[in-house]
Curated annotation (Swiss-Prot):
(6S)-5-formyl-5,6,7,8-tetrahydrofolate binds at R25, E82, K123, K474. It comes from the Bacteria. One of its GO terms (biological process) is tRNA wobble uridine modification. It comes from Blochmanniella floridana. This is tRNA modification GTPase MnmE. GTP binds at residues 229-234, 248-254, 273-276. Its EC number is 3.6.-.-. Binds 1 potassium ion per subunit. PANTHER family: TRNA MODIFICATION GTPASE GTPBP3 (PTHR42714), TRNA MODIFICATION GTPASE GTPBP3, MITOCHONDRIAL (PTHR42714:SF2). It is found in: Cytoplasm. Residues 219-386 form the TrmE-type G domain. It holds the Pfam family MMR_HSR1.
Length: 474
């Protein structure tokens, strides 16, 4: 640990403001001294005690409940004292100030420093540390549940299995390289190939599960797009159930990107309203808006392509609609995301609201202005999200998910790199029909890359970025 981290740290762990209970947390070597100064005794370990807290003159400050966890059997691996008092901000500030003035070696904790100490003292790994923040910041029931699974080690255990396999495999390969002047036998070659293929298959599967974990954490990104005045903003307002976007008959009202989160049956959805795609526009602001819209489309998990149903006949418009959409999307992206065509303004075209799934892309007829067909669209969004998550995991509903974990884009990028290094090693093996230094180097890179998920070999600036994203007191 760093020199400044040998200090004893203290912070208010509950949110700022008034509440029924306020909690102060203290961690470090000087916790027993703090307890003696505040209570004239050291509380019983792992036992809730109702004690009187006194100031430096011996006057009563507060009646509190204390919890004392001696090192190393605590969250941080250090002595920890939790003080549970009344939730008024003034009394909490006074108690914290009293603690900080006991010794010059007691200071206010940095954001996330309690969790950082738990990581540095090997009480948790980096995945579990990140999952604590994900529990706090969860935007849906499913995200919170999956983050709890990650905290329990579900994700870490699966990564550790692959890491151990690579470690053992590297040990075997290094011993083989010691006899590099001899060709390996057919039996040895097949063993090496099968072992590598098994690791590749395991890594590929965990990549898929991790992608599902990223979707659960960040929410399904739903981008509403289309031509100006098709009713995109009306649809946006209907989905989020509030008047967030300006609605007008004037074409091109939306110039910037609007973001909102909603939750459908425990799954978070990131709903995005975009500027319309106007043909042959020379307006600089409109062009900037359309460029932003294209960027959001390139990052979408699900695209709602909105059309004015009065501009397209129901029977002959499908191919024209898809062609107009393809103009705004890269050829790669259009096959990688869910796309739903929204035939809006059914109140003006006098069409029946409903969903048509006979073509490649589902088509939903609705009236965003009158809120007709919105429930059908929400069900479609949820069903599509479950398909996206289900194709990478082993559950088909929120209730069935008992072992899925939450993940971050950082984890997915690392695993994708590991997968590529392993594929490179396989190519080397197939081409040379033996192991060599290049093969061993690919395995080494895969090993080192995967270790970064746990925080091993992870740059200090990345660790600092991860822990400083926590609130103070966590």
């Amino acid at each position: 640990m760093k020199n400044n981290e040998i200090d004893t740290i203290a912070a208010i762990s509950t949110p700022i403001g008034r509440g029924g209970i306020g909690i102060i947390r203290v961690s470090g070597k000087l916790v027993p001294e703090v307890a003696m100064k505040l209570f004239n005794k050291i509380p019983k370990p792992r036992t809730a005690e109702y004690l009187t807290c006194i100031d430096h003159n011996g006057s009563i400050m507060e009646k509190v409940i204390t919890l004392f966890f001696p090192e190393p059997h605590s969250f941080t691996g250090e002595n920890i004292l939790e003080i549970h008092g009344h939730g008024g901000q003034m009394i909490l500030d006074l108690l914290l100030d009293r603690i900080l003035n006991i010794s010059s070696r007691i200071r206010l904790a940095n954001p996330g420093e309690f969790t950082e100490r738990a990581f540095l003292n090997e009480k948790i790994d980096l995945i579990q540390a990140e999952s604590i923040a994900d529990i706090i910041n969860a935007t849906s029931y499913q995200a919170a549940k999956s983050a709890c699974n990650s905290l329990q080690g579900h994700f870490s255990n699966q990564i550790r299995i692959i890491l151990n396999k690579i470690t053992n495999f590297r040990t075997y390969i290094e011993s083989t390289l010691d006899f590099s002047d001899q060709e390996i036998s057919d039996i040895s070659y097949q063993h090496i190939y099968n072992t590598l293929q098994n690791i590749i298959d395991n890594t590929n599967q965990i990549c898929k599960l991790t992608h599902s974990g990223v979707l659960l954490r960040d929410g399904i990104k739903v981008v509403i797009a289309g031509k100006p005045n098709a009713g995109k903003s009306s649809l946006f307002n209907s989905l989020i159930n509030k008047d967030r976007a300006i609605i007008s008959n004037i074409s091109g009202t939306t110039r910037d990107i609007l973001h909102e989160y909603i939750q459908l049956n425990g799954i978070a959805f990131h709903i995005i309203d975009t500027a319309g795609f106007k043909k042959n526009s020379t307006n600089e602001i409109e062009l900037i808006g359309m460029q932003k819209s294209k960027y959001e489309l390139s990052k979408a998990d699900h695209i709602l392509w909105v059309i004015d149903s009065t501009d397209y006949s129901h029977n002959n418009s499908y191919n024209n609609i898809i062609n107009s959409l393809k103009k705004e999307l890269s050829s790669n992206n259009i096959e990688a995301v869910f796309i739903t065509i929204i035939r809006n303004k059914s109140d003006l075209s006098f069409e029946h609201n409903g969903i048509d799934t006979t073509n490649k892309y589902a088509c939903i007829t609705l009236s965003a202005l009158l809120n007709h067909g919105i429930d059908l669209l929400k069900k479609h969004l949820y069903d599509s999200a479950m398909l996206q998550i289900h194709k990478n995991s082993n559950f088909s509903s929120v209730e069935e998910n008992q072992g899925n974990f939450i993940a971050r884009k950082r984890h997915l990028k690392i695993l994708q790199k590991v997968f590529q290094y392993l594929l490179s090693a396989k190519t080397q093996l197939q081409y040379n029909m033996t192991v060599n230094d290049c093969f061993a180097e690919d395995l080494k890179k895969a090993h080192e890359e995967l270790a970064q998920i746990f925080g091993k070999l992870t740059p200090d600036d990345l660790l600092e970025e991860i822990f400083r994203a926590f609130c103070i007191g966590k």
